[in-house]
Amino acid sequence: MKLLQDLPKNPRYSILLEPVWAIPGTIVLFYAPLYMKDAGLSDIEIGLINSVNLYFAFIFQLFAGSITNKLGRKRTTLIFDLVAWSIPMFIWAFSQNFWLFLIAYLLNATSKFVTVSFNCLIIEDVEEHKRSKVFAILNMIITGAGVLTPIAGVVIADFGIGPTLASIYFIGGILMTAMFFIRNRYTDETEVGKELMGMHSQTRVMHSLASSLRLFGRSFYKRRLFPIILITVLSNLILQLNFFQVIFFKEQLKFDDRVISFIPVVTAVTVMLLYLVIIPRLKRRSEEKYVGFSIILSTAGAVLFLLIPVGNIAMLFLTLIVLAAGNFILQTYRDSLLMNRLGTHEKADMFSAVQTVMTLTAIPSGYLTGLLYHYNPMLLFSVILVLYLLLMIIMLFLPDPQKHSQVIESYKNM
């Protein structure tokens, strides 16, 4: 594909294989709250599972950078993809009670290792100005997989959400497992990864963890980095708080399963039009400018969300378009901006530290989300709007870059 010709081997093969994960993954993640409700779990139980998942994700995240440096990006990605996705997919396929869901989500929490290792694997050998392209294509594939959710919606309408989702979980588990081994076969350890594996081969994990936390502490004094970290952390918190969105559409706004199944389609079409048609025609600007614009767009979408009348499909789709555009631009340029501002040899440790703070702030969100939704669903989404307004304030402190310099000193100068 011409689109991928200018990319190195790792991101090229990762992008080509990503649909194998994205198609079943997008469907099951979208319907997961309804699947748990169908199994008899209450709002509070669902929120509790989410919080426990985030708590253990926080624990695993503490060690993600050091483990990635010790085992290598490639090996870490394979091991924890199997633990975090292959095994839980098969457990979810047969989950009919709180405890099975809890076990599956506990295993899935190890995906925090993959968040660090996979991002390093696909980015470290890529030229800096091409990294936003890699993130954009991956985000587009994951979102674009949503065009298949209406098919799942039709099957759900005929056979019920339980049997349909159980089948998708099981088949998805088989496909994902095969994909993980194939991707491992066709990717290589990055040059930085090889160097760090040598440096950390005799280093204890706890010592490496302490070094990464010291590096993260320094970031609070870096004006070019600190606002980016805050935006990354808060935007992730918003994502966690949106967990009950699909339940809200069904229970409060009274949309049926067929309408709900088209929600990912609207999002996917919006993202593809943005990436393939609109963004290429925009004047090239800094990543900071795109992040600021995306926050404004997302805030507008959060306002529209609170104004959707019961059963109004047109207003629903308009809101989804605005939110999809804002979130796609935000995730693409936020992640690229963060990775580009981290030092060459510190990406794994620093990215892991940022992810740790993200997870720490999100830990209470699962249970809190369940409580807020149970008390007043509109209150939950009002809190999300407040967080977007806070992001608008933070974006005013994003520096307009003159040079794309690294902001963290190397290990050699520690």
Residue ranges: model-predicted function:
Residues 1-11, 189-228, 411-414:
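Juxtamembrane intracellular "pre-TM" segments in multi-pass secondary transporters
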Residues 19, 88, 99-114, 314-329:
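Hydrophobic core of transmembrane alpha-helices in multi-pass small-molecule transporters
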Residues 60-73, 157, 274-287, 373:
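Helix-to-loop junctions at the C-terminal end of transmembrane segments
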Residues 106-142:
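Cytoplasmic helix-loop-helix junction between adjacent transmembrane helices
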Residues 113-126, 328-342:
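Intracellular juxtamembrane helix-capping segments at the cytosolic ends
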Residues 173-196, 392-399:
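C-terminal membrane-cytosol helix-exit motif in multi-pass small-molecule transporters
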